[in-house]
Amino acid sequence: MNRISIRIFSILFILASNAALAQSNGDAVSSKKSTPASASALTIDACFSPKNYPKNAKLYGWITKTDYAEVVDGVLYAVNASTLAKTQIIKVDSFVKITKTAIKSLTGEDVNLFGIPQIKWTGDYQGWFEVGRFVMAVDFKKPVTDNLMFGPVQVKYSINGQSEEAQATEYSPDAELIAVIKKDNLYITGRKTSASKNLANSGSGEIQITKDGGNGIVYGQSVHRNEFGISKGLFWSGDNDKLAFYRMDERRVTDYPLFGIQSRPAKANSIKYPMAGDSSHTVTLGIYHLMSDRLVYLNTQGTYDHYLTNITWTPDCKFVYISWVNREQNKMELRKYDAVSGGLVSVDYQMSHPKFVEPENGPLFIPGSNTDFLLQSESDGWNHLYLFKFANKRPIIKQITKGNWEVTDVLGFTKDGKYLLFENTMASPLERHVHALDWKESKVTATGMSAKIIDLTPSNGTNKCSFNAENGLMINTLSNYQTPRKIYLIDVTNQIGNSLTQNGPTKTKLPYTETAIPAGATITIGEGVNHKIIFESPNPIASLGLGKMEINKRMVNGFDQYSRIFYPSNFDPNKKYPVVVYVYGGPHAQMITNSWLGGGNLWMHYMAENGYIVYTQDNRGSSHRGLAFENAVHRQLGTAEMADQLDGLAWLKSQKWCDSTRVGIHGWSFGGFMTTSLMTRTPGKYKVGVAGGPVIDWSYYEIMYTERYMDRPDENPEGYKANNLLGYADKLQGRLLMIHGADDDVVVWQHSLLFVDKAVKAKNAQLDYFVYPGHKHNVVGPDRVHLYKKISQYFFDFL
């Protein structure tokens, strides 16, 4: 929900076969109320202790074409990619001291710095980094010395004002300029005075571009409530001369009060919160030309409440692409605009769907071309790649990947442009692999695709990669059900070359069966000489003696669906256990993956060690299973999801180890909505529920998300009514604990308060309620331990 899920770090992700699990000695689980009685050392505090998280390497990118930077035992090293030999650069303590001293001597200011920040390398051993409002230049070719005139770290320039005033920042590609948003207005700061006459004449090294920000006008920040893949609002051109930026006018949007309780009396702090069916904000895109000091806004036309996303500059910096989406979210146009005039040049692609469209990625340009690009699209029902090759200013569109699997990320092209690297679910929806595709030769057929596809990743599981096209090397972070974290350095160039001449070793056999490899594709896989392990985390919870985990796949309502079970370490299949169902169930989330975290968490092990089975199922509506799986919930959020969860409940109750009279359910956000729905719309099915931050009435939720899945309230009154939980408050059976953060600006507090009011009027509703003052949509920080103690105790007391 708004990309926020209730995933918690640190889990033991162990897949098991469907065979019966081994028995072990231990106390029998009571057929009555369960109480926390376990031999395991796992406590709730331990569930959130960093010592129980997989360890990670401290990598700082490529310091040269052949060496990457890494901190080990308090020292920054340059590590040779071929030999893994380390060359000491500087001690972390020395780096911190030199940096703080440089700032203090120049400005008199003290800054907080406790380690080496991420450094943007611009040359061999040279780069820059941020500390507060300061941009620091680093040159490790210089000797490590306290003499600031010759030291390796110096102040490059600073943002005027205090660092906390900057609402957003974005550096130009050459790192000589920075776009800054302060008090909702746009500024440009830097010492590259040759880029702008105004900047050269400013005296302060800063120029103000906009002046009407504030009071409902917002510049340069994320818009549309972060939907459509939007994560920022500032976009530099590749030539460092032009800056595109969002302008958002929220004056039509209703003010919504959040109350700060720390003042006396409490103070109302208003936010702009556009609820479904109400007036939305207006977004436009401006372009500022530094050299000519010219500001132009794109002529996007249409109604005021459209959506603009996927902002992409062409390589020659003459044009800007935008994915335009209508408010109904059933039509998308890929529009090309002239950066000088702001006029529309062409509409190069259109897509419509009777349910919804959701473009989240802009064009990826082919190396050496200012016109031809790749675009991700779900037009065939799965997220795949399409080549747009232009002739006479019109595109010829060719699909280059196909199959019942999804492209989940694109890493870019090899240096010679021959191969495209992309992340995908080809092996399994539970996994992520990175493949190299000979994209020019790829041919799509009725049954799939025929192409050279080389699996670059070293093992089954979740592989997250970053690729450096300049040196042909890729850093691959792997986790799976056996591996907390393992980091590989992969020679992509050699891996591709070797794979074309011989087959690699076969990867580990999966404990589940997947058959999504595209017909006709040549797949080469395997860990080999081109994979070097540069870091491996020990198992942080090996000594805790935790129980096993099992993943199943069943056909549910026409689709394969995955479920996961945590068992107690002393599990006895001949005894009866209470079950806690953990649910999310909403779009843009996948609870079950082949990874160490995998959507589970240590709290689930904690509950298992205290005598409960913990079950999770990814129902229709969740992600990475194709468009039909996700949009099955359209206009009826909650209905199909409940049907799938009830099928899972029936399966649970058919297991001889399940105490069918003692099944509880818990979830947060969309999971809180699901928990409340199942406790009230199917009363008596679950004995106990804990619902956190729940949507209660979809007409009170934000426009962008709600109208995509439900349309407007006046267009779909039946759907809104059927899934409005206020109409079911009097049907509640069993015990339900509802929890909310008082400052929640995603699912506003009003949702659960309205439900409390209905429950009180129902008189017989068994509703318990708890509020976390000062917390937003998730309870974070030290209070999270308190939250999970409360959730656990509720199940101990009533399930």
Where would I find each of the regions flagged by the language model?
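Serine-hydrolase catalytic core recognition
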Residues: C47, D255, C317, A446, ...
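Beta-propeller folds
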Residues: S10-L12, L21-F467, G472-L473, T483, ...
